[in-house]
Amino acid sequence: YDLERIELMKKTMPPLEVHSGEIGPVDYSTPACTYIPKTKSEKEACYSIAHEGKDELYPMGSLWSIHMEQGGRNWCVIQRCGVIPLSKIDVPLENLSLDPSRNYYAFDFWKQQAWKQTGILNLHELELGDCQVVTLTDITDKYVALIGSNRHVSCDAVSVVSECTTDTQRGRVYRLALKGFEELCVTYTLYVEKAAEITREVIHAHGIQIVSVQAYTDILQLTVVFEKKEAVLEMN
């Protein structure tokens, strides 16, 4: 193993606890995998396994949408896999069981990039074997929301315990409860309505050390190092 592969493994572990549910009508008339003669090239074989031609937008097994709910958070993780070389596409949000009239922030996990998205989701082209993971978080009625991290490909159902906003005597307080291990370094990306106005003084950390704060128009990136297994980030 090299360092790059080890880092990739860290970002996909541990596996998540999942529960089965209704996924709608499924066509079972075509097998998921077929026998591919060894005489075929790798590229010919991948097209055959996907049961699709080169012009198909959604070959079998290439597009996955997982709706997640945990600790006061709701978000959708979309994974697109290069089972064959894929062109860039625009996916209507209703095809992902999301309300297209709402406002979302998209976050590309592998590129660690965020952008606003409404109506459709833009996905880039993929070479054979490549993968894109994008999180969609509804920000319509929020002034602060976690939209991604670099800890786990689920963005982030592993190190984030809960998220909430409450009204207190100090005003509105945003609270992010976290878990990890000592010396774990994580960058959390948040949508903040007026991120450019945020100062270090209004961010409070317990059990973690804040090592970097980067503010953009409506994006705040906090890089932290865990000092304890359980930690809290608060922002007034």
Question: Language-model segments: what does each one mean?
Answer:
Residues 1-142:
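Active-site-proximal substrate-binding groove within the catalytic cores of carbohydrate-active enzymes
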Residues 61, 74-80, 88-90, 107-236:
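Non-catalytic C-terminal accessory domains or segments of carbohydrate-active enzymes
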